[in-house]
From Swiss-Prot:
<dbReference type="GO" id="GO:0005829">
    <property type="term" value="C:cytosol"/>
</dbReference>
<dbReference type="InterPro" id="IPR029063">
    <property type="entry name" value="SAM-dependent_MTases_sf"/>
</dbReference>
<keyword id="KW-0489">Methyltransferase</keyword>
<dbReference type="InterPro" id="IPR003682">
    <property type="entry name" value="rRNA_ssu_MeTfrase_G"/>
</dbReference>
<feature type="binding site">
    <location>
        <position position="76"/>
    </location>
    <ligand>
        <name>S-adenosyl-L-methionine</name>
    </ligand>
</feature>
<comment type="function">
    <text>Specifically methylates the N7 position of guanine in position 527 of 16S rRNA.</text>
</comment>
<dbReference type="Pfam" id="PF02527">
    <property type="entry name" value="GidB"/>
</dbReference>
<feature type="binding site">
    <location>
        <position position="81"/>
    </location>
    <ligand>
        <name>S-adenosyl-L-methionine</name>
    </ligand>
</feature>
<feature type="binding site">
    <location>
        <begin position="128"/>
        <end position="129"/>
    </location>
    <ligand>
        <name>S-adenosyl-L-methionine</name>
    </ligand>
</feature>
<keyword id="KW-0963">Cytoplasm</keyword>
<keyword id="KW-0698">rRNA processing</keyword>
<comment type="similarity">
    <text>Belongs to the methyltransferase superfamily. RNA methyltransferase RsmG family.</text>
</comment>
<feature type="binding site">
    <location>
        <position position="142"/>
    </location>
    <ligand>
        <name>S-adenosyl-L-methionine</name>
    </ligand>
</feature>
<keyword id="KW-0808">Transferase</keyword>
<dbReference type="GO" id="GO:0070043">
    <property type="term" value="F:rRNA (guanine-N7-)-methyltransferase activity"/>
</dbReference>
<protein>
    <recommendedName>
        <fullName>Ribosomal RNA small subunit methyltransferase G</fullName>
        <ecNumber>2.1.1.170</ecNumber>
    </recommendedName>
</protein>
<keyword id="KW-0949">S-adenosyl-L-methionine</keyword>
């Protein structure tokens, strides 16, 4: 299915408290205000930011089971999608945003401070390869790298129960097929709410083949 901007805002408003909605509106305003200075999102998507970026990020939240505080790492956060949106929607969350471009690092930190969530949102301003290994409960990556590059890079940030949420375009099925000989786990391809040609790879128990039998596609 696809959404209009009005439908996207209504979808969010029906799922978050008023204060969270205000935070998301402020996030949108800050990103649009910054656009003349750096290309945070494609100019062609600015008029559909609620559909293409806010709801596209927020649709990941219901995929995470309810429980205690989560440690979430978002790879290649860019303008803060999905990581900053998720952090606003889940106040118990501890979020790490990984971004290597200096102007975007500074902007992500500015947004976290301005939104009042800097105490639980860490911006790791370096390349993923240089980041110290640590286990996280959720790993997300939106337009960061193809799956055959992403899994080897990011696996050291997972544990046995880590949930992987990987928004993809029309390449989701082919990217998944490309890793079946080298990786095992429970993999699903879930249609995106915001683009009929896009999908989300949802995975758990992800392991290199030969490193244990924790599930199969």
């Amino acid at each position: 299915m696809s959404m209009t901007e009005q439908e996207a805002r209504a979808w969010i408003e029906g799922r978050v408290p008023r204060g969270t909605m205000a935070g998301l509106e402020k996030l949108v305003a800050m990103i649009l205000d910054e656009m003349p200075r750096q290309n945070l999102i494609a100019a062609s998507t600015a008029e559909s930011i609620w559909t293409r970026h806010i709801v596209d990020s927020a649709q990941l939240v219901p995929m995470v089971g309810k429980g205690g505080p989560l440690r979430w790492i978002d790879l290649g956060s860019g303008a803060g999608f999905p990581g900053m949106v998720v952090a606003l929607m889940l106040p118990e969350l501890r979020m790490t945003l990984v971004e290597s471009r200096r102007k975007r690092i500074d902007f992500l930190r500015f947004m976290a401070e301005s939104l009042g969530i800097a105490d639980r949102v860490t911006v790791a301003g370096q390349r993923l390869e240089m980041l110290e290994s640590s286990p996280h409960d959720v790993i997300s990556a939106r337009a960061f790298a193809p799956l055959d590059r992403l899994l080897p890079l990011a696996h050291r940030f997972s544990h046995d129960a880590t949930l992987w949420l990987l928004p993809k375009g029309r390449s989701a099925a082919s990217e998944l097929e490309a890793v079946t000989t080298s990786w095992q786990g429970d993999f699903r391809v879930v249609p995106s709410m915001t683009d009929p040609e896009a999908a989300i790879i949802v995975a758990s128990q992800v392991q290199p083949r030969g490193k244990g039998q924790k599930g199969r596609r």
